[in-house]
Amino acid sequence: LTVYFGKNGEGFADVEFSIYRIAEISQDGSYTLTGDFKNYPVNLENLTSSGWRALAQTLDAYAARDHLQPLQVKKTGQDGQVVFSGLSTGLYLVKGEQYEEEGHIYKPEAMLVSLPALSEDGGWSYHQKVYCKFDSPETSSEFVHRKE
């Protein structure tokens, strides 16, 4: 699994990413929570794209709250890519640390990635490349004063 984190073709280097295996995948493509995630009260069925996004955020929050240990932790190279290898089939939570550049903070959104995934030709793809979505609120050195 290759994860890319960058903007306008420029990769963000030296950003730490963690990966967690959250579910097993069956022959019919359904998921069953596993490991540290098996007792969390979440639904993995009939999700829309916004539902998958919300699920990733929820599982990210559980992992942080419960101090779960990731399966692997790696940093992006100069090209903004990090490769997680040796992964078995299943559903994975991928989360990254923020990156700061020229007064902007880029925080990658947690995401869920299935291995294998359905490829464009309808077959199964075991070699995925995913691109991080991110929020980039501006940082400021000015203080905001609130009137009392």
Regions found by a protein language model. Give the residues of each.
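Solvent-exposed loop/turn and edge beta-strand elements of beta-rich ligand-binding domains
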Residues: 1-148
